[in-house]
């Protein structure tokens, strides 16, 4: 397996929507974000987990930040909890089940030109984009 794809797959979060951008001839950026709302008793809760990372074409991690936490609120006040972890070790791997989403898109990722990106959901399916009337077309485009 290509080391770049293996590293991007290791950084991808379970359950997340992911965007991989070709920054320049030597690097890629991964944005993997997941969040959901829940409620119990009198509280509303928002849970989130996101990863932003830059990786070179050889699969070495330049930088990676994982931020996760939760926000609670009700009529009487708010609480929040957040954890931030910074990574710079080229051998670091995030254990998760989300690798298949990146592997499914390996050919698209490797074909990216500078400034291009590919976006996919937690199952690795290409995201549907909305086209506005100003673009001359209205509706959904795959």
Please give the residue ranges for each predicted region:
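Intrinsic structural disorder
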Residues: 20, 30, 128, 139-142
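Negatively charged, low-complexity tracts enriched in Asp/Glu with abundant Ser/Thr
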Residues: 2-38
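Short intrinsically disordered terminal tails
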Residues: 1-3, 79, 135-142
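Generic N-terminal leader/processing signal
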Residues: 1, 17-20, 65, 97, ...
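Acidic, low-complexity, intrinsically disordered interaction modules
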Residues: 27-135
């Amino acid at each position: 397996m290509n080391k770049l794809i293996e590293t991007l797959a290791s950084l991808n979060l379970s359950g997340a929507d992911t965007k991989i951008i070709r920054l320049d001839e030597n690097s890629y950026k991964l944005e993997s974000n997941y969040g959901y709302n829940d409620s119990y008793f009198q509280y509303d809760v928002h849970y989130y987990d996101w990863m932003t990372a830059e990786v070179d074409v050889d699969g070495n991690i330049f930088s990676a930040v994982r931020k996760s936490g939760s926000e609670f609120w009700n009529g009487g006040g708010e609480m929040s909890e957040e954890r931030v972890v910074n990574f710079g070790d080229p051998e670091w791997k995030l254990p998760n089940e989300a690798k298949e989403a990146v592997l499914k898109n390996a050919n698209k990722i490797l074909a990216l030109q500078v400034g291009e990106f590919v976006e996919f959901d937690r199952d690795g399916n290409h995201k549907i984009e909305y086209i506005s009337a100003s673009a001359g077309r209205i509706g959904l485009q795959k």
